[in-house]
């Protein structure tokens, strides 16, 4: 088999079928207007002390999860923060839970990613100010004590992590009594209050973190929850936005599916939440011009050496034929076909990929059209 890099002038196959999990492998190609909307929205939240709910809408495979992971990268966020002249955001990506206790699962997903040792180190020089601030938010003395314990280096970080997880038995709980923690966390109100308080502390005066960015991916799964859990999920979103009035940017990634469409949205996302949506970012199906721009940029990012043809190893007429054959489909479907076409050509040592090559594999690479 011929050397892939030398033959196809590509570092590797650029057509991913699923979003990368390694941040170093995440790149953005084309779709400049969508990228710009995210950059501007995040930059506004970095600059301005207000909380915002954004709905990201599109079909399966349109790039919502990819956007969440890319804009969760520290180097991307650092660049946006430097542009705004502020500190970096605290960002995390979770998926909407489908189990019996969605709020507890959301809470655990966020606590899983909370590095208490790192947090304490970051806030060590302003912990006194943070404690004073905690006294000013809400009236629940228990929640205030828990929040202070998170930032208190005198308490073992693993002990407070056990407590937050609910893994501390009554005997060990006694060790936290002196810090004002007299009971375990027990219900959705506790979990929501802890998260709201934590987010507010993280962004105190925008000194250490300019804002908290929370992405909830696969939000369309709300359609498979029972009515009680749909209520709980909507209440959580409403309460977290109300209780973190400053510096929270919440993205909901929603995929149009057989279970949920724009017309069905009101059945699952209540008016109390919809009324808080400040912006909708749509991931539309790409037209031929947008797709070809995306393809040129993507291939350029993976190019090994140079070539006068920006689509190489594909001839442009192959790209045009593929667009006609596939019709109006998602970016993922284009990527699937091009990935398979490239792999088959590599196996059979066919390069460049011209019309003859395309026609020989056409039945295999556009099987999903029917």
Segments and roles (model prediction):
Residues 47-208, 331, 345-354, 359-369:
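P-loop NTPase nucleotide-binding core
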Residues 49, 230-233, 327, 334:
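Active-site-proximal structural scaffolding
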Residues 43-46, 72, 199-203, 224-227, ...:
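Alpha-helical repeat scaffolds in large eukaryotic proteins
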Residues 1-54, 74-82, 354-370:
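A short, basic N-terminal segment
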Residues 289-293, 298-370:
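C-terminal alpha-helical "lid" subdomain
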Residues 1-14, 18, 173-321:
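The catalytic "switch" region of P-loop NTPases
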């Amino acid at each position: 088999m011929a050397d892939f890099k030398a033959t196809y002038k590509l570092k590797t196959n650029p057509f991913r079928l699923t979003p990368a999990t390694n941040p170093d492998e995440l790149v953005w190609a084309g779709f400049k207007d969508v990228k710009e909307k995210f950059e501007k929205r995040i930059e506004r939240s970095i600059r301005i002390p207000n909380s915002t709910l954004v709905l990201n809408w599109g079909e399966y495979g349109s790039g919502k999860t990819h956007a969440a992971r890319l804009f969760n990268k520290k180097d991307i966020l650092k660049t946006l923060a430097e542009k705004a002249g502020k500190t970096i955001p605290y960002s995390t990506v979770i998926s909407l839970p489908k189990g019996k206790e969605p709020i507890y699962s959301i809470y655990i997903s966020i606590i899983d990613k909370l590095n208490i040792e790192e947090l304490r180190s970051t806030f060590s020089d302003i912990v006194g100010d943070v404690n004073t601030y905690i006294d000013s938010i809400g009236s629940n003395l228990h929640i205030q004590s828990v929040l202070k314990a998170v930032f208190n280096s005198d308490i073992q970080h693993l002990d407070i992590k056990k407590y937050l997880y609910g893994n501390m038995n009554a005997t060990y709980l006694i060790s936290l009594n002196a810090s004002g923690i007299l009971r375990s966390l027990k219900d959705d109100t506790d979990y929501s209050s802890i998260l709201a308080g934590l987010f507010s502390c993280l962004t105190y005066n925008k000194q250490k973190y300019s804002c908290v960015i929370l992405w909830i991916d696969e939000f369309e799964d709300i359609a498979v929850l029972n009515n009680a859990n749909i209520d709980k999920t909507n209440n959580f979103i409403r309460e977290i936005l109300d209780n973190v009035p400053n510096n929270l940017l919440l993205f909901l990634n929603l995929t149009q599916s057989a279970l949920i469409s724009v017309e069905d949205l009101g059945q699952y996302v209540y008016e109390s939440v919809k009324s808080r949506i400040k912006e909708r970012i749509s991931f539309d199906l790409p037209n031929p011009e947008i797709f070809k721009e995306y393809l040129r940029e993507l291939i350029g990012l993976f190019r090994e050496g140079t070539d006068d043809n920006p689509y190489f190893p594909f001839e442009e007429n192959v790209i045009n034929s593929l667009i006609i054959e596939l019709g109006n489909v998602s970016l993922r479907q284009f990527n699937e076909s091009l990935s398979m076409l490239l792999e088959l050509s590599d196996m059979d040592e066919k390069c460049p990929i011209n019309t003859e090559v395309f026609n020989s594999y056409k039945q295999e690479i556009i099987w999903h059209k029917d």
